[in-house]
């Protein structure tokens, strides 16, 4: 009875374990893989800080609009009291006693607050221009972030479909293994039957092919392990789930290659690098305008409040006599401020103008580089398309060749060498076709990226 219970328990645990493994294997599509990898990317988190810093500069510029300069100073300490020998004076008239002296036996806490503030009223639009320059700078930072993101998305595209390619190659090798086993059985049968048509030199060639085939299998196995480990890393797989691509077969993407001028025009309109340089140029130009306006006199509203209190130091009644240890005073008014560091401002303007020219030249250089990049990727994609088409035709021919050699061998008219050659060629072309499909998809993704076209359009198509 106990043995039955133990056996049932073991069976249940094994079944539960099998279910858990099945539940932990998750197949995800490219968009899910891409979004999760981007969310976990330390590189993207690092680049995002540049965007947040640029957005913080907008807040700093906007803060100059409302009371940009407010200051509070406090002073605290112990001070002695005062005493006077004149009995005809009230405490608030002690300033009239020329013989007034400190009372070192009477100590009290001294407290003083000084509050001052300045509010811009009219600055010729210098603050608004500074805010606009900061906003354009943040826009440039966002475009730079998008450019880095596009680079990472391209690498993730290759990584996702590398897994699909590895799965395809594994299946092809399994099919090839079945054919290798079939030929090996036939050779063994011929040996047992003492068939004189069996050429030992052909057997040696087959044994060599088997060894080479085992090397291929080992390479594929290690590549698969590498891809899986890389997937686990980019997806931050801390829950122990097994992630696999939802796409199980590697086929050419459905998008067609457009004329080259389509990608050139798209690149000039969509590339985030060009948008970042353009926004940076506008930001520099706006900043120069702000600097020029800062060189003009500005109208400000300023005010202050001073308060001091010391219990043993009475406040004096004469407004012209202030007791610095016991007072309450304040005021406000308009003021005109003019910066007199003209040489420094002029140097800043000249430096900004140099940066403005630099931004213009950078755009021209970037356009030249992008044009060459688009043309190069267009050439690679077009060539990859031809390779896929021709390899597919060659594979069809190799399948007919292998079928014919298999029939000849089965009827005793063929040779092992010819059958092995046909089988090797078919496997070689199958692997080559999948590799070239992967290269075609990758080259088309690079072409789209160089044109500023989102990679997700390839998957959608």
Predicted regions and their residues:
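Periplasmic alpha-helical coiled-coil/stalk elements that build and connect Gram-negative outer-membrane
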Residues: 28-32, 149-266, 425-426, 443
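Acidic, low-complexity, intrinsically disordered peripheral segments
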Residues: 23, 78-82, 432-461
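Amphipathic, heptad-repeat-like alpha-helical segments
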Residues: 42-49, 161-182, 210-224, 274, ...
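Sec/SRP-type N-terminal targeting helices
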Residues: 45-49, 63, 121-149, 199-201, ...
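Bacterial N-terminal signal peptides
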Residues: 8-17
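Alpha-helical hairpins and coiled-coil heptad-repeat segments
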Residues: 184-203, 400-420
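A small-residue-enriched
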Residues: 35-122, 154, 237, 264-347, ...
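Sec/Tat signal peptide C-region and signal peptidase I cleavage site
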Residues: 18-22
